[in-house]
Amino acid sequence: LVIGVQFLLWTTSGLIFSWNSIESVRGENLIRSQEPLNLRSQEIDDLGELLDSPALAMREDDIVVSALLRTMLDRPVFELTIVRNKKQLVVLVDAVSGKQLSPIDEVMAKRIAQSDFADDAEVRSVEFVESVGSHSEYRGKELPAYRVEMEHTTDTVIYVSANRGAVTTRRNNQWR
């Protein structure tokens, strides 16, 4: 009888999990599609100007480990991983102006979350997260970050890295 009950519970839970697609659990079905970066549409006169822009935000003794050109809110940005004072950190730089953008502020985090979210939902709340507990829904992820809660039936929460200005993860009712 005990084995039968265990088997019934195991089978039932398996069926429940198989009905929910992993994309819905991860919130991937609520990601807005993004246009690819078109450098011709930006205010860049030549490629040399683009490649010079990260140097404007760097210090003389910085060592570049990696440079990634990507978009943030339809603008080209460089995500630089650098070593500064023997510490590795990420610096976000506007690829056109060379202005350092990181760490981003709450307003920018809100805009990034809204541009990532497929539905036109308002933001319910924004919280700056510097540390999390071992049972947090955001454990093991990049900190500091902004926790942006969307006003939506799925109770979606979008986490945005303060240093990278990028969505790191999404949580919703199905995940919880």
Q: What role is predicted for each listed range?
A:
Residues 9, 86-88, 100:
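Primarily extracytoplasmic ectodomains and periplasmic/lumenal surface modules that are beta-strand-rich
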Residues 57-91, 129-158:
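Exposed beta-strand-loop-beta-strand "reactive/processing" segments of non-cytosolic proteins
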Residues 1-32:
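Internal alpha-helical transmembrane segments
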Residues 26-72, 103-137:
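Short, non-transmembrane alpha-helical segments in secretory-pathway proteins
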Residues 95-122, 143-176:
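Extended, hydrophilic extramembrane loops/domains of integral membrane proteins
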